[in-house]
Amino acid sequence: KRGHDVVLCDKNEELGGLMKLASVPIAKQDLAKVTQYMVRKLEEAGVEIRLNCEVNKNMLQNEFADYEVVMSNGASPVVIQPFTTFKHWATADDILGGKAFPGRRIVVIGGGSVGCETADYLAPLVYDRLPRDRKVTVIEMAPEVMSTESGPGRSLLVQRMMKKGIELICNAKVEKVEENKIYYSINGETHCISDADTLIFAVGYRPDKALADTLNELKITYHTIGDANSVGTIQDAIHAGYDLAKEL
């Protein structure tokens, strides 16, 4: 709108990033409309969109040598490496994105919004006529799940989880993971889960710094917004993009 020649590159086959995954959990499908709206506005503004396009050193040195660079490549889910010894593990993103498939005895490490929404998504439906015989357990270090969230959305989700029989273990810390066992402690007392067949990580995200390293190596000045700068909410990312666009 301000007259710039804008090229938007995304390494994925469609735009949206984590918004696509955020719209998968129960009662959050409407988030997909946000992405649809923004894509429509991009097209109306004449932005050149390149999908399946991961920006590399050669592109930065040649094709985009005279461009202002804005890095908004998001964040990656944190994986606790010592716990990957479990026989079958995945991140919540893997599950919601259909890249991994859980068994019937699932343990989710992390009781934040992502962990709880994933557990809710995987648990048997309330009043399901054909129960999937799936047991879901959430282990959270804080005194309660989704402790940083508030409002009716949190209350409804927690109520739904309890109705579905999801086991919520709070004030707990996973201490050790073996191929077939998960050990956690509460107030110094150790407990063991030995019947789980799937371990899911929902312990937050870490900004993806790979492109930043390349830009720094080439001594290219750039701007960082969204989760690539600091992991936050959808609103945070949208506002950051808008605020930066006003300055360029």
Segments from the language model and where they lie:
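Rossmann-like dinucleotide/flavin-binding elements
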Residues: 1-15, 51-62, 72-149, 185-248
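N-terminal Rossmann-like dinucleotide/flavin-binding domain of flavoprotein oxidoreductases
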Residues: 17-67, 147-172, 180
